[in-house]
Amino acid sequence: MMSTPAISVESLEKYFPPARSGWRALLQPLARPTELALAGISFAVERGEAVAIVGSNGAGKSTLLRILATLILPTRGRASIAECDVERHPSRARYQLGYHTGGDEGFYTRLSVRENLGFFAAMNNMSRAEAQARLALTAERMGIARELDRQVRTLSTGMTHRVGLARALLHQPAVLLLDEPTRSLDPLAAADFRRLLKDDLVRQHGTTLLFASHTLSEVEQIADRVLLLEAGRITAFDSPRGLCAATRATTLEDAITRLARRTAPVQSQL
């Protein structure tokens, strides 16, 4: 009997209203959305699998992750996290996932790192003892143990990024969604974090990982499969080795370049 996928996406579409200015902006709510971000894509990620989303800027990578993270709604279609529909049951879905992007972290910048993470732990209904134990473990893993009592506003960009990653991991989510996971990290810290993702979270703890990345060496190191998005459509979904074999390429970079040049998208199957 096949297990239920950790992430399921069915005929997912997302349109955004076109940008307008002046008097046209007054009619914005009445305008039919015309800018396509996702064009009815379907795919599934199995439990304990690591999948990388790869594509050019504007391909729909961040939009897909934001829908799965319950931050924006799809126009049509369905998406589920651990069998929880992200549109119908967003609170249940959020409990199953961790999400991090290198953008705005949404921290209380005048509070300490410890206070920020403690607040997040309380939002996830952790007891004080459980929160302290998980905070200590996660802080050590992410290399922020010495920064716990510093105000967030005093941290460097790279350190703030680490704190954001720690927050995403704090409640030990079943599904982890990451947008450019090693952005702003120095090479050594990035290598350590990649090992944490693949060896600790995915292999040892069975965490399901879906991440967007432009760094193909990172994709090769972490991903079991690669989902290639172009103009909101899935053009390929296979293992790095499978992509190379299908395109007769010797490297993943060559394979993705050849696939990106194809004009006819191929819809993946669940």
Q: What is each stretch, according to the model?
A:
Residues 172:
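Conserved catalytic motifs of ABC-family nucleotide-binding domains
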Residues 176-180:
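Catalytic Walker B motif of ABC-type/P-loop ATPase nucleotide-binding domains
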Residues 191-205:
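Helical segment within the ABC ATPase nucleotide-binding domain
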